[in-house]
């Protein structure tokens, strides 16, 4: 950083001083952000130490008498519960009737002249049965001829999930669902099994998970990969993940690899598909291979490898994400505060982009053709005005400043940010992909890194089926249980059309694996 003397500063003109002050403000904000982050980390560490100290203190304490509770009622506003909501929440669950009666002797004393029974008072409570383990003991009946001619006949038996293994479809489905739906690492599941007297090591469970994905569930994944190409628009994103072993070679501290995600744009008559694709790098070869037979538009966050693919192929377009264009302005406003940001370039940019996006949202219920028409009529000039304004402001400020970098992102992405104007199928943002990859990033916080490249590939398949199942509103455990029950029985089939009957939106799956999730 160049340091100017007092004399040099006195000789500078007003414009130069404005540029220097603007640059110093940006540097100050950046340093403040770093300081806040460091303080937050320190605070988290202190909280963890306090929590550990408290746990040790509690463990060493003598049991004390439970204190009496004095109820204090504080008047507050409570939203009135919708009539029948509890009944709706409990509907469809298995029910058991618990009768509360009086004995004939008690009734005879109270009613010496006889009695009649009135309608019972009915109320409901929710009961839970913790995990229950049952041993399936199979008895395969064997028959022999009475003539002792050596003929022996066995009853047919279903094919095992794995040879000489105690694993059942329901058990493996529960493990997969725990890890990939509920972000519960295998180590924690192993401890939970142990508390129930079941010894299942993490290695055993990991082998079951990888084999299930590789041998059986990959068939569904491959079919979904074929079907996602039917979409006109695919959203794409990627997120890093560390892998400890690549092709059996152990890497100290793990290798930084990437989990790519692809999600189709669901319009009327289409089914949502979410596909994860693990790859050892962020190289353009990976999306090139995944999208090799796709023709249409890919919505991304501006990563240049997608732009490279679009330049290679005439049948592939790339659309930008306006939320990514708006985000740095929003972060700047948050860092300095709303009051300070009033009238700033960041506030003006944020307002202009937000207005365009809000207006586009009003076209959601229109047909593709009508949406394109309205965008051309209503939004085209506003988009033109935004880019003209951005270029003008960029020429007036320090290019390396926070706002300068935010403006240049929009300017560099202009070609891709404009694509939505000419295609009613294309949205203004890449939210589909960001929402699809979020469960993976949550799970990653728990498992930190993946043990092997085989495990990473299996994880891609399993996250794909979980997120596609959720998007199609089916129960993920029931779905995995069905798949692991049915697919092994078809492994010798040359005709793979049975797979379509097991896709998340098939009538059979929708009937057998309904989700009880209700949108509030």
What are these regions (language model features)?
Residues 2, 50, 142-144, 149-520:
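Catalytic center-proximal scaffold of phosphoryl-transfer enzymes
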């Amino acid at each position: 950083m160049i340091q100017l003397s007092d004399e040099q500063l006195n000789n500078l003109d007003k414009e130069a001083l404005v540029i220097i002050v603007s640059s110093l403000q940006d540097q100050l904000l950046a340093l403040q952000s770093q300081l806040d982050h460091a303080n937050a980390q320190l605070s988290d560490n202190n909280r963890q130490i306090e929590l550990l100290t408290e746990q040790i203190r509690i463990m060493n304490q003598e049991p004390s008498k439970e204190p009496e509770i004095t109820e204090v009622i504080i008047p507050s506003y409570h939203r009135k519960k919708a009539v029948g909501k509890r009944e709706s929440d409990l509907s469809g669950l298995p029910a058991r009737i618990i009768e509360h009666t009086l004995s004939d002797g008690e009734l005879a004393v109270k009613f010496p002249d006889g009695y009649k029974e009135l309608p019972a008072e009915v109320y409901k409570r929710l009961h839970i049965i913790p995990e229950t383990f049952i041993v399936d003991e199979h008895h395969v009946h064997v028959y022999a001829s009475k003539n002792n001619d050596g003929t022996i006949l066995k009853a047919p038996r279903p094919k095992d999930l794995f040879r000489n293994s105690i694993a059942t479809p329901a058990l493996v489905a529960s493990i997969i669902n725990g890890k990939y739906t509920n972000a519960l690492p295998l180590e924690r599941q192993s401890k939970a099994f142990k508390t129930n007297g079941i010894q299942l090591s993490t290695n055993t469970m990991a082998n079951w998970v990888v084999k299930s994905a590789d041998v059986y569930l990959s068939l569904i994944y491959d079919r979904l990969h074929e079907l996602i190409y039917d979409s006109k628009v695919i959203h794409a994103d990627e997120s890093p993940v560390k892998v400890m072993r690549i092709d059996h070679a152990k890497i100290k501290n793990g290798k930084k690899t990437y989990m790519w995600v692809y999600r189709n744009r669901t319009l009327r008559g289409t089914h949502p598909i979410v596909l994860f694709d693990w790859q050892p790098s962020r190289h353009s070869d990976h999306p090139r291979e995944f999208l090799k037979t796709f023709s249409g538009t890919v919505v991304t966050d501006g990563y240049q490898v997608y732009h490279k693919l679009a330049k290679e192929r005439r049948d592939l377009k790339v659309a930008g994400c306006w939320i990514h264009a708006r985000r740095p302005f929003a972060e700047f406003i948050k860092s300095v505060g709303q009051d300070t940001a009033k009238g700033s370039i960041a506030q003006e940019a944020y307002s202009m982009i937000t207005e365009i996006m809000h207006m586009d949202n009003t076209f959601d219920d229109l047909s593709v053709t009508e949406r394109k028409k309205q965008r051309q009529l209503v939004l085209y000039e506003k988009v033109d005005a935004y880019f003209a304004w951005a270029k003008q402001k960029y020429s007036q400020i320090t290019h390396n400043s926070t706002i300068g970098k935010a403006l240049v992102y929009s300017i560099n992405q202009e070609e891709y940010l404009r694509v939505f104007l000419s295609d009613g199928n294309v949205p203004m943002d890449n939210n589909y992909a960001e929402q699809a990859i979020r469960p993976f990033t949550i799970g990653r916080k728990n498992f930190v890194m993946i043990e092997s490249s085989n495990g990473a590939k299996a994880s891609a398949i399993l996250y794909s089926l979980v997120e596609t199942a959720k998007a199609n509103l089916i129960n993920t455990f029931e779905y995995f249980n069905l798949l692991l029950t049915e697919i092994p029985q078809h492994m010798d089939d040359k005709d793979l059309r049975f797979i379509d009957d097991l896709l998340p939106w098939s009538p059979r799956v929708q009937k057998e694996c309904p989700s009880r999730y209700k949108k509030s």
